[in-house]
Every structure is written in structure tokens, then in C-alpha cells.
């Protein structure tokens, strides 16, 4: 009797093995039929939930997963959230650029003389040495250019800066 049971289990296992690997998805789904109508919360009748094995065989598995995802999570809310996130990201970027530009204009106005204070106006007209005058204006110019490059890098622009160090190289700020 145990040999008959073993033989029956072996045949059943072989049949199940080949039936699982014979379909594209691995399993054949039976058609489900609902004998009674099903209603939703508002009293509207729901369509019958019948699996069509031909449709499942044609579709790829990710599309079935997408259908299940859209069943549980309506697409309207997902797109609204995505659009809100994109708007917030763009809005934050625009605010950052505006604040950087505002800061740049305030610095440039202060240096050029638009927003000068009493200390800037009382600057002596002549210095003892011409080298001192050149050095002072050159160092001021270098500070202004450093501020411009920094703010340009913050705003997303890149300035190329060439320098010589054992040959010619291109460096970015």
C-alpha cells in the first residue's frame, strides 16, 4: 500500500511540475464567476471579477503589478503629490537664486558706491606710494571677482579658470 501511495505522489508531483512550467506566468488562473451581484458603498453594482487567462498570458508581469498598484492607490493623488513636490523643488531653487542675486547686488552696490557709508567716503585721495594705491585697488578687485565667482557657482554657472602648474590645465570653480 505504501508503494501505491508513493507512486501516486510521484505521478502527482510530475504532473504538477509540468503544469506549473507550462504556462507563461507559472500558474493557470481559473475563471472566477460571481453568482450574486456585488455592490459598492454607494449602491452601484460592481463588474464581475473574472480572470481571462489569454489576457494574462499576453501581458507582462510588471503591467499586472501596475494594475494592482493603481487599484489600491488612485493615480490622481499620486500625480498631485508628484506635481507638488516638483513645484516645491522648483520654488526653493528659484528662491535660492533670488536671494543669491539680491546678496550679489547688495555687495556690488556697497563696493561700487551705491550703498556707501561714511568710512568709504573718507578714504584718502592720495597715498604715500603709488604701489600702495595699486595694491589696494587690486586687492579690492580680487575680492569682488571672488564674490562674483562664488555667487555664480551657487546660481549654477561655472567659470573656467586657467592656471599654469606644470603645463596648461583647465580648472573649475
UniProtKB/Swiss-Prot annotation:
Keywords: Amidation, Cleavage on pair of basic residues, Hormone, Secreted, Signal
Signal peptide segment: 1-22
TM stretches of this protein: none
Gene3D superfamilies referenced in this protein's UniProt entry, alphabetically: 6.10.250.590
Main location: secreted
PROSITE patterns the UniProt entry points to: GLUCAGON (PS00260)
Subcellular location: Secreted
Residues annotated with Lysine amide modification: 166
SMART domains: GLUCA (SM00070)
GO cellular component: extracellular region; neuron projection; perikaryon
GO terms of molecular function: neuropeptide hormone activity; peptide hormone receptor binding; pituitary adenylate cyclase activating polypeptide activity
Single GO BP term: positive regulation of ERK1 and ERK2 cascade
Residues cleaved off as propeptide: 23-80, 170-173
Family per record: Belongs to the glucagon family.
Function summary: Primary role of GHRH is to release GH from the pituitary.
UniProt name for this protein: Glucagon family neuropeptides
Classification of source organism: Eukaryota, Metazoa, Chordata, Craniata, Vertebrata
